Structures are given as structure tokens and as C-alpha cells.
């Protein structure tokens, strides 16, 4: 049973207490961070809030024993929410955050909403986000070995050919300074070529495709490239 309360008697009897109670003791099921001195911080200086403390205790178990996936979820999702919750905003992206999005489930001052019902909606939403983030982290880690193998087996180190689409940019950047293009099959059955960005997140390429190809399709592109099945650039 999930109870939202600050009643000290109820808190004392609870099996697990999160974000209230003024105590952090994972073995005793106490996960608050509001006490004087907080509840510790990560190696990168981001302090733990209650979400991070719960994830620290149960994250690996939630990720079916995969410590790498659990760490990826912490670094990509949990630690950001912890940073915002603890006011440690340096380095946190500006704009609307997941924390703010979830807080929008609370009734506004103009609404006569049921706070508990809104909380349950927020929990369902946050649970779905967490599930998808875990799946994404697991997929990214699984993809790394596939891309690494493609880099190792490439006939030309400048062109990496994948047998199926997998997320590749982070792995290519970490393992290959020579790769310029990545080729892979699309869902439509066609093959695609993508340029490798100069840096992760950059729109600048290590080596762009010829400018004369840009915006061409079908026969026009086929004529200029010499490829009789080229479709669009």
C-alpha cells in the first residue's frame, strides 16, 4: 500500500519511506535526503535526492542485474532529476525538464483537484518514462558491440556497414577516428548512408557528401552519382 503522509507514527511503521522522515538508511528502507548534511553525492559532485537513493539501492535489480544499464540510467536520467531536486543546476540543460513536466500533474491554484489522484497519474507517467529509458539504455549498450564489430570488420575504415540499423554515433566516435560514413538498411528495405558528425550533437560532418547531390532525387540523383537505384539525398 502506498501512503502519502508526514504523520510520524505512520512513517515509523512503514517498510519503506521515501522523501520524508529525515533519514537515509538503505538497509532500513529509509530514503530521505532533506536531513542536515544530505545523503551523499556522486563522484561527479551531483548530490543524491530520494530518487537517486532508491535507484542506488534497487537500480541494478530493476535492470535485471545489468549494472551497465543501471549506471547508464543513473547518469542519463536519475542524476539529472536529483540535480534539479537538490538545486544543483550547474550543467543541467535549460528549458522544461522532466521534473517540471511531472510537476504539472499537480492541480493549479485555480483547480479543485484531488492531489492523490493527480499523484497516481504522475506515478503512472513517470513509470512509463523510466521503463522506456531502461529499454533505451539497454538497447544502446547492446548496439555498441554490434557497431564495434562492424568497425573492426570494415573493408574500408572510412565506411562502416551495418547489417541492421543500430544506434552508432557514440560508438563510432569512441572507437574510430577514420570513419566518415555509415551505411545501413532502413525499415523500408532501402539502404541509407549517413555522414559521421565531427562531434556528437554537431551538424558539421567529418566529410560531407558532394554538394552537387544535395536535394536531388530519383533520376537526377542517379545521373550525378552513377547509381541506378539512388533515391534521394
Residue ranges and their predicted role:
Residues 82-167:
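Hydrophobic, aromatic-enriched interface-forming segments
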